[in-house]
Amino acid sequence: MGYYSLTEVTAVQYAKEHGYFEKKANVVCHEIGDGNLNYVFKLDDGEKSIIIKQALPYAKVVGESWPLSIKRATIESKALQIFAKYVPEYVPVVYSHDEELAVTVIEDLSRLTITRKGLIDGEEYPLLSQHIGHFLANVLFYTSDFGLQSEEKRVLEGTFVNPDLCKITEDLVFTDPFGHYDTNDYEPELQLTIDELWSDKTLKLKVAQYKYKFLTRKEALIHGDLHTGSIFSSPSETKVIDPEFATYGPFGFDIGQLIANLLLNALSREEEQRGVLFFHIEKTWSYFVETFTKLWIGEGVEAYTKEKQWLPIILQNIFTDAVGFAGCELIRRTIGLAHVADLDEITNKETRIQAKKQALSLGKELIKYESKNADIQLFRTLFQQTVSGGIKA
């Protein structure tokens, strides 16, 4: 029959045909996805529920003028299964994957809240940083040359060649926000700030280097789009979802993207409400370092993991990359395609424009920052300097 797009009616038919519900079951189906690339349906018969996710052959956020390969659904399914191999507690269960229809049937996580929405609403997730730090350390270590035999790593790397979605990252994170491109989207009040950004040759040279790292450093399997909208949370649970951008890339990429999105939420808050965001930024890194170090010592398979001075160099390189990638993400989410609700839903226009100018300023400082001795306090320091007016956009 070939590929066809599901509807709420045909999603139920599909689920029944594949044994997820009895033929006579009264199944309620709703499309619940608010993402940019896929259909997501929730199906519930009153006793059990599932999620059906289908990749579209184009970017939903733009339309059929932006075609995309549906093979990304297979990438996502395989990534979730790789993640589950190392940290099953932090990902949804994958029940099945249909490559022809680009359909994945997965665990329903509606008991949890999308972390971005929860943070905007002021909810607190005390275990978020611990869980994400552990998730990142395990996945990045075990899919790298340090935790995986080189032959196995090369084979796995070939499984995650993801040209369509990597091209989106190349363009929307590293290229378009730094010049005159049609994909950019911003308020006229930001134009002067943006003109200064685009004319900053030192900044562009640094962005070029981070883009090159993304293109060439195949260090570990990365989620590729790890923001607070790609995480479900509750006070006791954390689940990472939507790894359709998964590919082999730099260790620091996912870390930087996550930190940037926590910073964006911090910019949307009053000063006295920001502490929890910096707690999560700093604890994510400390849990990552702690777990990665334990794995390096106990599970390292590469010969030079026995050299005591090698690990500190690796960790410093990861941190340096995370700083720059965070800066790129801050700018992209402010003036590029696919904004974040943290800033866009600030109701007072003057406050919203000010927060966006601060996001651009902070992003620029993170990209241009150069120090081999910086630690995780850097984010708090530069943030405070930015919002207090010590750094101008």
From Swiss-Prot:
Involved pathway(s): Amino-acid biosynthesis; L-methionine biosynthesis via salvage pathway; S-methyl-5-thio-alpha-D-ribose 1-phosphate from S-methyl-5'-thioadenosine (hydrolase route): step 2/2
Database matches in Gene3D superfamilies: 3.90.1200.10, Phosphorylase Kinase, domain 1
GO-annotated molecular function: ATP binding; S-methyl-5-thioribose kinase activity
Residues binding substrate: 225, 332
Domain of life from the UniProt record: Bacteria
EC number assigned by the record: 2.7.1.100
Record field: catalytic activity: 5-(methylsulfanyl)-D-ribose + ATP = 5-(methylsulfanyl)-alpha-D-ribose 1-phosphate + ADP + H(+)
Record key words, sorted: Amino-acid biosynthesis, ATP-binding, Kinase, Methionine biosynthesis, Nucleotide-binding, Transferase
Biological process (GO), any one: L-methionine salvage from methylthioadenosine
Enzyme kind, highest EC tier: transferase
A UniProt-annotated Pfam family: APH
Binding-site residues for ATP, renumbered to this chain: 38, 53, 107-109, 242-244
Family statement: Belongs to the methylthioribose kinase family.
Function per UniProt: Catalyzes the phosphorylation of methylthioribose into methylthioribose-1-phosphate.
Record text on subunit structure and interactions: Homodimer.
HAMAP family in UniProt: Salvage_MtnK (MF_01683)
NCBIfam families: MTRK
Full protein name: Methylthioribose kinase
Species the sequence originates in: Bacillus cereus (strain AH820)
Recorded name of the encoding gene: mtnK
